[in-house]
């Protein structure tokens, strides 16, 4: 539930 490199709400790249 954290923002990743793409800003996705699951914190994926």
Swiss-Prot record:
Tell me how the protein is altered or processed after translation: Not glycosylated.
How is activity regulated here?
Strongly inhibited by pMSF, chymotrypsin and SDS. Inhibited by the trypsin inhibitors Tos-Phe-CH2Cl, Tos-Lys-CH2Cl and SBTI, and by bivalent cations. Slightly inhibited by the elastitinal and metal chelators EDTA and EGTA, by ethanol and by non-ionic detergents.
Q: Which GO terms describe its cellular component?
A: extracellular region
Please tell me which top-level EC class this enzyme sits in: hydrolase
Named from the GO MF annotations, one term is: serine-type peptidase activity
> What is the pH-activity profile?
Optimum pH is 9.0. 20% of maximum activity is seen at pH 5.0. Inactive below pH 5.0 and above pH 11.0, inactivation by acidic pH is reversible.
Instruction: Please cite one Gene Ontology biological process associated with this protein.
Output: proteolysis
Q: How does the annotation summarize its subunit structure?
A: Monomer.
Instruction: Please report the name of this protein according to its UniProt entry.
Output: Serine proteinase
């Amino acid at each position: 539930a954290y923002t990743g490199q793409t800003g996705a709400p699951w914190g994926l790249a």
